[in-house]
């Protein structure tokens, strides 16, 4: 089980909406529809808006820069239109000179709503996105820790099985040492299998060298007991081979190969 498997991370990259006047024009249309349906515009959710447009994937500096650029662009566009159509602009402006003008009242309300939106956006940029980044970081650290814990548990399980099987094989080998005539082929097979189990157990214990848990300490003691019993059996068999080398050639070769690789 690997929570950070590369195959699971092979996802399509999200595409953020382009920050443009058309994007905000669409939101304005939604405001109009909301007012028509009797929905309070104050309930506008800035977080949902930014997430729907995938803006939370943008760096904060880029988001602020793009919004500032759009604001400057709109001001410049308005100035250019005023210069090119000054007379029309004067006529347009006269419609807002009356303090009781309904259009002016709606414009002021829109300005107030826009200010609320910008305040919420500023709060999101300064606080919420920063908090989200911290949460993501914590989650990744948590998943990494779970991987480490799972790997440790898997090693513990493998070590327990190896030591348990090793104890049974070591007991059988020790009993075989007292049988006459000596079953050379069986003893050689037991020695080879025991050596593999002891080597694997030692490697797992080395990977847990930094652990001081009581359970690991117990497994280390079991490993030492198994190793000592194995060494006693090897000593007995070595003495038998030295006493009668001609009749125990295969067993002698097995013992020599173990000594060379140890």
Swiss-Prot record:
Keyword tags: Golgi apparatus, Membrane, Protein transport, Transport
Compartment annotation: Golgi apparatus membrane
Classification via Pfam families: COG2_N, COG2p_C
Topological category with respect to the lipid bilayer: Peripheral membrane protein
Lineage top rank: taxon: Eukaryota
Main location: Golgi
Keyword Membrane in record: yes
GO cellular component, one term: Golgi membrane
Presence of keyword Transferase: no
Record-linked InterPro entries: COG2_C, COG_su2_N
GO biological process terms, semicolon-separated: cytoplasm to vacuole targeting by the Cvt pathway; endoplasmic reticulum to Golgi vesicle-mediated transport; intra-Golgi vesicle-mediated transport; macroautophagy; pexophagy; retrograde transport, vesicle recycling within Golgi
Signal sequence, renumbered to the chain: none
Stated role: Acts as a component of the peripheral membrane COG complex that is involved in intra-Golgi protein trafficking. COG is located at the cis-Golgi, and regulates tethering of retrograde intra-Golgi vesicles and possibly a number of other membrane trafficking events. COG2 is required for ER to Golgi vesicle docking. Not essential for viability.
Miscellaneous field: Present with 3270 molecules/cell in log phase SD medium.
Assembly, per entry: Component of the conserved oligomeric Golgi (COG or Sec34/Sec35) complex which consists of eight different proteins COG1-COG8. The COG complex interacts with the Rab GTPase YPT1, the Glogi SNAREs GOS1, SEC22, SED5, VTI1 and YKT6 and the COPI coatomer subunit gamma SEC21.
Record-given protein name: Conserved oligomeric Golgi complex subunit 2
């Amino acid at each position: 089980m690997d929570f950070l498997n590369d195959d699971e991370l092979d996802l399509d990259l999200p595409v953020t909406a382009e920050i443009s006047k058309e994007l905000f024009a669409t939101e304005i249309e939604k405001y109009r529809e909301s007012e028509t349906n009797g929905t309070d515009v104050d309930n506008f959710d800035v977080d949902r808006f930014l997430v729907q447009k995938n803006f939370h994937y943008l760096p904060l500096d880029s988001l602020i820069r793009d919004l500032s650029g759009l604001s400057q662009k709109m001001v410049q566009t308005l100035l250019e239109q005023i210069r090119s159509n000054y007379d029309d602009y004067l006529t347009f402006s006269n419609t807002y000179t009356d303090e009781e003008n309904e259009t002016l009242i709606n414009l002021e309300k829109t300005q107030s709503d826009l200010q609320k939106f910008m305040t919420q956006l500023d709060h999101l940029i300064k606080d919420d996105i920063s908090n989200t980044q911290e949460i993501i970081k914590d989650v990744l650290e948590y998943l990494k820790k779970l991987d480490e814990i799972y790997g440790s548990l898997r090693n513990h399980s493998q070590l327990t099985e190896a030591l348990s099987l090793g104890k049974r094989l070591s007991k059988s080998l020790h009993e075989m040492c007292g049988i006459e005539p000596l079953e050379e082929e069986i003893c050689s097979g037991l020695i080879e299998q025991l050596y593999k189990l002891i080597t694997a157990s030692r490697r797992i214990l080395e990977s847990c060298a930094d652990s001081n848990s009581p359970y690991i300490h117990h497994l280390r003691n079991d490993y030492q007991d198994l190793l000592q019993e194995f060494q006693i059996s090897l000593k007995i068999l070595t003495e038998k081979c030295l006493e009668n080398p001609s009749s125990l050639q295969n067993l002698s070769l097995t013992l020599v190969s173990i000594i060379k690789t140890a």
